[in-house]
Amino acid sequence: MYKKSKKEIKNIRVNILKKTYEANSSHIGSCYSVVEILYALYFLKLKKKDTFILSKGHAALAQYCTLFEKKILSKASLDSYGKNNTNLMAHVSHKVKGVEFSTGSLGHGLPYAVGKALGEKINKSKSKIYVLISDGELNEGTTWESLLFASFHKLDNLFIIIDYNKIQSLDFVKNVLKIEPLKQKLTSFNCNVSQIDGHNINQIIKSLKSKKNNKPNIIIANT
């Protein structure tokens, strides 16, 4: 594992727990399932010209705690989580420093990311667009429409990470709407698909480097 990562990841997890307890509000399971993914992006991958969208906005606290560990958010700002008149609520807001796009209602982050990726490609920019979605968002029609669009326009500057924790708010994913065989379905959309351990930093970074020309990149992160 990368140097310092264990300590920083632990700090992020501890702060998620602390703020959940203090505010009595958080989707803590959804937050914990993406910690290593957020760490890999913010600490090891994202460049200034790149864009990250957290489509599963209910994992807002994980993003806030990562931004704090990265020293983008102040302690005073993080301490305001869940309090009156704060911008740091249980669903992510673009009013928070370091956040690109407000999300919460599932299925909206990926369409935005696809549009952003198309715009960057038209402008011949070298920037990359990263979007983290939940497996529950695979129940949304907008997700599959966006994948069709991204594939048609050959958006190889787009990296879609699926937090495959296999559970939704009310039940396991397989009991709500079966999405398997997931990798085969996504590959059939002419996407570059890999499947990894979503808590393994080395696997996350390796998969983010596995880019193919003219194909959107999808990482199924088992968490």
Please place each PLM-identified region on the residue numbering.
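Cofactor-binding active-site loop characterized by glycine-rich and histidine/acidic residues
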Residues: 26, 31-145, 151-152
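A broad, structural surface signal
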Residues: 14, 18, 36-39, 184, ...
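Short glycine-centered, acidic/aromatic-flanked micro-motifs in structured strand/loop junctions
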Residues: 23-24, 103, 133-134, 162, ...
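A broad detector of the eukaryotic-type serine/threonine protein kinase catalytic domain
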Residues: 17, 21, 134, 166, ...
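Thiamine diphosphate
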Residues: 6, 10, 83-95, 116-118, ...
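N-terminal capping segment at the start of a domain
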Residues: 9-25, 163-165
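Non-catalytic, mobile gating and regulatory segments of ester bond hydrolases
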Residues: 1-4
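Short amphipathic alpha-helical interaction patches enriched in hydrophobic/aromatic residues
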Residues: 20-24, 45, 67, 190-193
